[in-house]
């Protein structure tokens, strides 16, 4: 495959969620796998609902996921192209004016359904004469414009679904322009795909029906050789099978980030859920690129469980090496000669990254005294080995205490953990003790704030 060009085309009318992240990542990984180009295109022709704040948040969310566009476009800056395309379609007799109101169209659909017929537009507007149209416009009606579909079956070899086809006879001529002259999704999308030389359109299976219309639009505007390859993936749904929407606030990418989920875990879940590859932690997007294969996606619904994401995020965190998180640690003043050993000591006990701040306080800051069995702690303090300490200091120290007291298991270790860390559980003390150091250990075993 030579230099594919793909795009992710969100509407900036809200914040993107985990379901939107799926096509964004699939397109990005596809471009990186085959050394192609990934375009971010904002479908913002709806000037009333599109907001700059949403566009900005989408860019932030994509960057957090590791998605870096090669180009960014905005449809609101490209209206001249769409007007030109509409004129081409009019000149070819493929774009025609219609004057029915929404209520009139709804009545037509209901009559068709009552007769057991599919609710397809009857093309009544094609029978209007110039005088008829002039009269309707004199009454104050303004036309919306439909694309006249040619009869026949649209066929394509779908990257994911295989051989696919839709009979144009089963579809209504789609509306491309509203009464106010604004554009619906279909025309600008095709015009931009042609202009940007998009080679592959990878999107959700809810767009399968659109494909038949768009194939005809590609052919009408650019000829048979300019139709891209299509791939329609299964959609992410909730664990109960419901779809996601921009109103699903708790699963917006921004919300998942704020909850402390790892971006790599969100990416892995978005890409691997509903595929033949088990969802698993990854260390980088490059790992997802290396294993990327659209053929692994299932035809069945991809059910996403937020509870599983929490577990995946923690497992992802546990395997991240120090170099990967060095800058994130430094942002919280976790630096210096202890930082690497600290990360390797605590990462396996973290649920979210910010938990490491509390453990850094245990190592470098002060904690309130928590003492049980003060006589035993006094003995432990008096038997602390001399520094320097390494990972063997803990076993040497506790071995000596075991020999002197006969204690073992929880009776031996629990009072020491409480005194040294203030916690019931946590990282291996063999790794933490050298980081805490003898001075703090002595003070904490004595019941002092240290």
Swiss-Prot record:
Any one cellular-component term (Gene Ontology): cytoplasm
Its EC number(s): 6.1.1.17
Keyword RNA-binding: no
Protein function: Catalyzes the attachment of glutamate to tRNA(Glu) in a two-step reaction: glutamate is first activated by ATP to form Glu-AMP and then transferred to the acceptor end of tRNA(Glu).
GO BP of this protein: glutamyl-tRNA aminoacylation
Annotated organism of origin: Beijerinckia indica subsp. indica (strain ATCC 9039 / DSM 1715 / NCIMB 8712)
The protein's name in its UniProt record: Glutamate--tRNA ligase 2
Taxonomic lineage from the root: Bacteria, Pseudomonadati, Pseudomonadota, Alphaproteobacteria, Hyphomicrobiales
InterPro entries, sorted: aa-tRNA-synth_I_cd-bd, aa-tRNA-synth_I_codon-bd_sub2, aa-tRNA-synth_I_CS, aa_tRNA-synth_I_cd-bd_sf, Glu-tRNA-ligase_bac/mito, Glu/Gln-tRNA-synth, Glu/Gln-tRNA-synth_Ib_cat-dom, GluQ/Sye
Assigned keywords, A-Z: Aminoacyl-tRNA synthetase, ATP-binding, Cytoplasm, Ligase, Nucleotide-binding, Protein biosynthesis
Positions occupied by motif 'HIGH' region: 10-20
Source taxon at top rank: Bacteria
Known catalytic reactions: tRNA(Glu) + L-glutamate + ATP = L-glutamyl-tRNA(Glu) + AMP + diphosphate
Cited Pfam families: Anticodon_2 (PF19269), tRNA-synt_1c (PF00749)
Oligomer and partners: Monomer.
Family, similarity comment: Belongs to the class-I aminoacyl-tRNA synthetase family. Glutamate--tRNA ligase type 1 subfamily.
Top-level EC class: ligase
Gene Ontology MF annotations: ATP binding; glutamate-tRNA ligase activity; tRNA binding
Cellular location(s): Cytoplasm
Motif ('KMSKS' region): 243-247
Residues the entry annotates as binding ATP: 246
